[in-house]
């Protein structure tokens, strides 16, 4: 039942191994990614990547509008709207407008509240939430062409998913909700690109993003889970804005011995971040849910539908159901009293 997740890294790396022999710490990982994000040309985006990014965006809009009336969003709006700044950007599906940073937060919350959003199968990151929430808010504040918007979406997804690839599965196994912790980099990359950051400023934006990780898997089953992509969108956007005004940070935040990857995971694989930049695209690994729940339980739902159809079963004919699943299914979705 958890084959989609288990396939992420069948060739698991050794966990917690120190540098051995002639092994050297990685160098210029953060700079390489920053250089790529600021220099990648919109016109070089392959057509299949452009189409997948469009599908990702449309799927995200549907999720955000669909979740906009949920109690979670109502509560968040009630708490934070009185403290919002100028009415600069939309909260999709609602009449209220907020300042760009609060709008990014709210759209991130609403797009994830039903757990119906896109999934990067290699890492189980939900890529669009942090990135699209941030760049939509920015695009309402300053003019952005459709081509540049789509390119920024692709670059943001590339950044967050490549960074996620480098630390999965140990980062996730340690209890971090990777959509938030990696998503903040995607939001910083995408908004930074639209703000026209230099390579140096993008380096700083990544550093500022890295120092704001959110959230914890213990929050699954509560209103705080969708807060994670919302806060990632808001924090990544904030990082890019600060960097645009030369607010400095570490220039090696991904690869430093006390940097993001080494603190939040074990044995990170930095080649996942840098190899194939501009040649392979993580958005092509995106998937879209037929059911509004964690993907690990989808096979069980499919099985129930198949049995019902094959045997023409009705609910009153079923006394009980016994499922054999991977322990991860219970860990992620076995919430008997969701809040």
Q: What kind of region is each of these model predictions?
A:
Residues 125-126, 291, 295:
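Short, surface-exposed alpha-helical recognition segments that flank or form part
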Residues 294-339:
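Intrinsically disordered, low-complexity Ser/Thr/Pro/Gly-rich interaction regions
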Residues 3-284, 327-329:
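N-terminal core-entry segment
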Residues 284-292:
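A short glycine-threonine-serine/GTX helix/turn-capping micro-motif
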């Amino acid at each position: 039942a958890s084959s989609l997740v288990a396939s992420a890294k069948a060739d698991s790396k050794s966990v917690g191994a120190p540098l051995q022999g002639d092994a050297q710490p990685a160098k210029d990982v953060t700079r390489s990614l920053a250089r790529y994000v600021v220099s990648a040309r919109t016109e070089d985006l392959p057509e299949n990547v452009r189409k997948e990014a469009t599908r990702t965006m449309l799927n995200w809009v549907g999720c955000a509008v669909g979740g906009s009336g949920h109690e979670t969003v109502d509560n968040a709006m009630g708490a934070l709207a009185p403290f919002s700044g100028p009415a600069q950007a939309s909260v999709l599906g609602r009449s209220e407008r907020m300042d760009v940073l609060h709008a990014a937060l709210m759209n991130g919350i609403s797009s994830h509240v039903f757990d119906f959003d896109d999934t990067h199968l290699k890492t189980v990151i939900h890529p669009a939430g942090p990135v699209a929430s941030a760049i939509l808010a920015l695009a309402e504040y300053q003019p952005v062409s459709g081509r540049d918007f789509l390119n920024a979406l692709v670059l943001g997804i590339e950044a967050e998913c490549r960074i996620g690839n480098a630390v999965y599965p140990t980062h996730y196994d340690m209890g971090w909700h990777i959509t938030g912790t990696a998503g903040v980099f995607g939001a910083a990359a995408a908004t930074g690109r639209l703000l026209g950051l230099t390579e140096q400023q993008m380096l700083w934006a990544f550093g500022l993003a890295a120092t704001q990780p959110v959230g914890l898997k213990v929050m699954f089953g509560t209103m705080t889970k969708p807060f994670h992509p919302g806060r990632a969108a808001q924090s990544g956007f904030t990082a890019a804005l600060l960097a645009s005004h030369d607010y400095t940070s570490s220039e090696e935040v991904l690869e430093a011995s006390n940097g993001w990857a080494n603190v939040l995971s074990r044995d990170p694989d930095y080649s996942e971040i840098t190899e194939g930049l501009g040649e392979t695209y993580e958005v092509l690994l995106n998937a879209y849910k037929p059911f509004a729940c964690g993907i690990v339980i989808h096979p069980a739902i499919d099985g129930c539908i198949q049995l019902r159809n094959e045997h023409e079963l009705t609910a009153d004919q079923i006394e009980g159901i016994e499922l054999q699943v991977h322990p991860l299914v219970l860990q992620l979705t076995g919430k008997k009293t969701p809040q």
